[in-house]
Amino acid sequence: VDDSSVDAPIGLAMVSFIALYNVIELNVIIFFIFERKSGLYFWSFFFATWGIFFHTISYLMWNFGVLKNAVAWVTIAVIGWVLMVTSHSLVLYSRLHLILYDERILRLVLAIIITNLFIGYVSTIIVAYRAILALEPGPYVTAYPVYETIQVSLFIQEIIISGLYIWYTYKAFQMQEALRGAQASRMLYHLVAVNILVIILDVAVLVLEYNNPYNLQTAIKGMVYSIKLKIEYSILNSPINLVK
């Protein structure tokens, strides 16, 4: 598919509006359903949601000519991308505390997130701004897709965190199964299935990065992250109900 084809703008608009609709639903969850509006999980969820909004709206306005200032576009897009991806990883990290009590592993996961934040973003942001501000932007324009591809690959961390969650949830439910029987088994199957779906979505983001037109795949990323956050809310409630 070529970005210049007739179908590309239609596809971009469709996935963007799905992402923005999901942002509305996520804000309903944030402001009307969350009982505790504090802590790492809440604020990570909040910033990830608004990161999706800024990421999606920046590319939507740029591609349809509403936003014409390249610096403003890159700034909004960068803010959205950093908030969307890093905050989502922190959402995953914060819920690990419900079933994982090994501080060494938790510290390692947090260190990976922080390290990838600097490795994955700083160089890409510099290249992005140089590509639009440099007197001779050619080398930076050529380098940017390479940096962005490496950056996305670094976020295999989300797959790792989801894998840890599946493993330690399984171990926790094994201890509860003798006490709660079928209820614990059903909840375990649900959690494993949903987390596998999240991993599939993470893999889809990586595949999109390497195989789809830039404009369309950036829009799809926003939609995918909005779906993952909606799934995330359903994941959170199961272990909470089990340990009550």
Name each model-derived stretch:
Residues V1-L117:
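Membrane-proximal first intracellular loop
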Residues P9-A19, V71-V85, T124, Y144-I161, ...:
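Extracellular loop 3-seventh transmembrane helix
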Residues I24-N27, S89-Y93, S162-I166, E232, ...:
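Alpha-helical transmembrane segments of polytopic integral membrane proteins
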Residues R36-S44, A134-P139, A178:
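Interhelical loop segments of eukaryotic multi-pass membrane proteins
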Residues K37-S38, L100-L106, Y165-L188, L236-K244:
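Intracellular signaling interfaces of 7-transmembrane GPCRs
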Residues I52-V66, I119-L135, G163-F173, L197-L216:
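Helix-to-loop junction signature of class
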Residues L92-L98, A128-L133, S234-K244:
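A cytosolic-side transmembrane-helix exit/cap motif
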Residues L96, L100, I105-W167:
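Membrane-proximal helix-loop-helix units in multi-pass membrane proteins
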